Amino acid sequence: MVKKSFILVIPQEEKKGSVEFQVSSFTNKIRRLTSHLELHRKDYLSQRGLRRILGKRQRLLAYLSKKNRVRYKELISQLDIREPKTH
């Protein structure tokens, strides 16, 4: 398994309960699970876990987008993730 360096976007004094910290930790988990699933395609339990984490991250990003658009844009660019489609 290829391990990539984890993203350290949030400073240490930032609270672990903050939206930015949660989104960055979910992004780390998503990247780890994605590399795992490239090797183990039939690991359906991990696929389900990945979908759950993706949904949680999407909901947190939607919340942050509504509350503070500037912080949302900064976080999206720092984590190098795409902006979700809006319906």
Curated annotation (Swiss-Prot):
SMART domains attached to this UniProt entry: Ribosomal_S15
CDD domains: Ribosomal_S15p_S13e
InterPro entries named among the record's database cross-references: Ribosomal_uS15, Ribosomal_uS15_bac-type, uS15_NS1_RNA-bd_sf
Claim: Cell membrane is one of the keywords in the record: no
Keywords noted in UniProt: Chloroplast, Plastid, Ribonucleoprotein, Ribosomal protein
GO molecular function, one term: structural constituent of ribosome
One Pfam match: Ribosomal_S15
Protein family membership: Belongs to the universal ribosomal protein uS15 family.
Subunit comment: Part of the 30S ribosomal subunit.
Protein name: Small ribosomal subunit protein uS15c
Protein source organism: Illicium oligandrum (Star anise)
Name of the encoding gene: rps15
